Amino acid sequence: MKTVFLLLIRFYQKWISPALPPTCRFYPTCSNYGLEAIEKHGAFKGGWLTIKRILKCHPFHPGGIDPVPEKKQKD
């Protein structure tokens, strides 16, 4: 599942994103955030973090630096 999500994001970055004007208001970009979130947290939590990030990326949000949260350590 994780691999499928990562391949979808990489496909978007290689083939779809170059045809569109740059619009992401954040650093890292939403697609790079998605790659990092899924790598770090897995398909489900990373996917959820990515969806939340994409929903924040609109003209009424100021944007800025928004790193992927660190993975919590279990005691």
UniProtKB/Swiss-Prot annotation:
It holds the Pfam family YidD. It comes from the Bacteria. Keywords: Cell membrane, Membrane. SMART domains: Haemolytic (SM01234). This is Putative membrane protein insertion efficiency factor 2. It comes from Bacillus licheniformis (strain ATCC 14580 / DSM 13 / JCM 2505 / CCUG 7422 / NBRC 12200 / NCIMB 9375 / NCTC 10341 / NRRL NRS-1264 / Gibson 46). One of its GO terms (cellular component) is plasma membrane. Could be involved in insertion of integral membrane proteins into the membrane. NCBIfam families: membrane protein insertion efficiency factor YidD (TIGR00278).
